[in-house]
A protein has these predicted regions:
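An extended, acidic
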Residues: 144-264
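Short loop/edge segments at beta-strand edges and connector loops
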Residues: 67-69, 139, 226
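A structural micro-motif at secondary-structure boundaries
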Residues: 137-144
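Short coil/turn connectors at secondary-structure junctions
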Residues: 61, 79-80, 111-114, 150-152, ...
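DPxDG-like acidic metal-binding loop motif
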Residues: 76-136
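N-terminal subdomain of lithium-sensitive/metallo-dependent phosphomonoesterases centered on the IMPase/IPPase/PAP
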Residues: 1-88, 249, 262-264
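Residue-level signal for inorganic ion chemistry
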Residues: 22, 45, 56, 91, ...
Length: 264
């Protein structure tokens, strides 16, 4: 394994520089488009994507590339290591000038994240990890919570998602909040600020790869909603679903989500 500390330093610096560029693009005035699925994309997304691709691939020309704003290429599958990038995660928050947007970057090796950063510039928070060394926020070690009862849990999810006839066992009352950026939601679980985040629909690798490593290194458990492990840099760059939670809560959540069939 090559120098992960060097890779981490590279992606942390690049994420910070990308955030400065995003802010400059906002000052110039954002051009906003709609993707085929209806989600927004801005001139800042494209500018940060181009900057990060040049910055990172110039430094590591033998690494592959996967980004939300770059057309995918099967050539990445030939690389043992790739960068997985979301130039701006939480574009809706970015447009609305809410502080939860972030820049997540992961280095994937042999299908698993080995270095990751989630930079949240508006809140001056930088989450980072390399495999086997723990997770940190602004240089301080972070740990997932020790909450062990759903009744005591705080979730980053929609309360409506956990209602309806699909649930064989009803969910107890819990505290719910929302954040637009999925990577930041995972970082908050890693830091113990929330106990879990749940998503029952497929999620793109660029939304969850960095958060997966940071959360796991902080002691959280990250799987799909059936308890299956994730693998990255596959032909279809999506994960079926997401359970990212404090370790004691994970089996309690799976008791309920295990009855829901896979979406794909």
């Amino acid at each position: 394994m090559t120098d992960l500390a060097g890779d981490l330093a590279l992606i942390v610096e690049a994420a910070r520089e990308g955030a400065i560029l995003a802010g400059a693009e906002r000052v110039k005035g954002l051009e906003i488009e709609r993707k085929p699925g209806g989600s927004p994309v801005t001139s800042a997304d494209y500018a940060v994507d181009a900057f990060l691709k040049d910055r990172l691939r110039t430094a590591r020309p033998d690494y592959g590339w996967l980004s939300e704003e770059t057309p995918d290429s099967p050539g990445r599958l030939k690389h043992r290591r790739i960068f997985v990038v979301d130039p701006i995660d939480g574009t809706q928050a970015f447009i609305a000038n809410r502080p939860w947007w972030c820049i997540p970057i992961a280095v994937i090796e042999d299908g698993q994240p080995v270095a990751a950063v989630i930079h949240v510039p508006e809140l001056s928070e930088t989450f980072e990890a390399t495999i086997g060394t723990g997770a940190r926020m602004n240089g301080k070690v972070i740990r997932a919570s020790d909450t062990d009862a759903l009744e005591d849990a705080s979730l980053l999810a929609s309360a409506g998602m956990l209602q309806g006839p699909q649930w064989v066992t009803p969910w107890p009352p819990m505290r719910f909040e929302k954040r637009n950026a999925l990577a930041y939601r995972m970082a908050l679980v890693a830091a113990g600020a929330f106990d879990a985040t749940v998503a029952l629909t497929p999620k793109w690798d660029w939304d969850v790869a960095a958060g997966a490593l940071i959360a796991r290194e902080a002691g959280a458990i990250v799987t799909d909603h059936l308890g299956g492990d994730w693998r990255f840099n596959r032909p279809d760059p999506r994960q079926d679903s997401l359970i990212c939670s404090a370790p004691a809560l994970h089996p309690l959540i799976l008791e309920r989500t295990g009855a829901i069939p896979r979406a794909s």
